Amino acid sequence: MSALLILALVGAAVAFPLEDDDKIVGGYTCPEHSVPYQVSLNSGYHFCGGSLINDQWVVSAAHCYKSRIQVRLGEHNINVLEGDEQFINAAKIIKHPNYSSWTLNNDIMLIKLSSPVKLNARVAPVALPSACAPAGTQCLISGWGNTLSNGVNNPDLLQCVDAPVLSQADCEAAYPGEITSSMICVGFLEGGKDSCQGDSGGPVVCNGQLQGIVSWGYGCALPDNPGVYTKVCNFVGWIQDTIAAN
């Protein structure tokens, strides 16, 4: 894993669709407020995504760490005040103790909000996994990441894409020696459809449960290069213990 790759994924993910298409490959603009757990991490600008897991905690990717973060909830168009947003500063930001910035193993981070959010139809938590998602499970990935294959176009409106969990064998074959037990691949081995990572730290939700966190990958929609995500089902104990201790 190169440092260049890691840097490329922070803030807005790399997008390299096979087709000359200025949209996330296979993706679409999410119906307004259909992803109420999606958050935007902001430090004067949107730089990563995350997921609300209860009224005072957000989960994201550890490689999205900044010492000061404002969490923005209830967003759809992140460049317009629409009246449903809640902006809350982070009180605590906790990276997994075994996170590796080189291999991106254990790429998970918890953010405690300085005050609880007001839960409603447009701001609501997503459930943690009760079990790991088997290969073939269909998932929803969302984010405000770059939508251009050449250049930069960060969309105003939240983007969604549907993609399946791949087998661990296929994931390891796609990235020999780079996949750990804390990573899963989601996407299509044949290429042509992908989330283009959406946004680093953002959610992969399967059957109503948070199964993945946008972590890394090589390009987008390239054959044999699916997106790689933090395997959230392996971290439920750590999440629960960390919340209880803080």
Swiss-Prot record:
Residues 1-15 form the signal peptide. Binds 1 Ca(2+) ion per subunit. Keywords: Calcium, Digestion, Disulfide bond, Hydrolase, Metal-binding, Protease, Secreted, Serine protease, Signal, Zymogen. It is found in: Secreted, Extracellular space. It holds the Pfam family Trypsin. One of its GO terms (molecular function) is metal ion binding. It comes from the Eukaryota. It catalyses: Preferential cleavage: Arg-|-Xaa, Lys-|-Xaa. Residues 24-244 form the Peptidase S1 domain. The record marks D194 as: Required for specificity. GO terms for cellular component: extracellular space. Ca(2+) binds at E75, N77, V80, E85. Its EC number is 3.4.21.4. This is Serine protease 1. It comes from Rattus norvegicus (Rat).
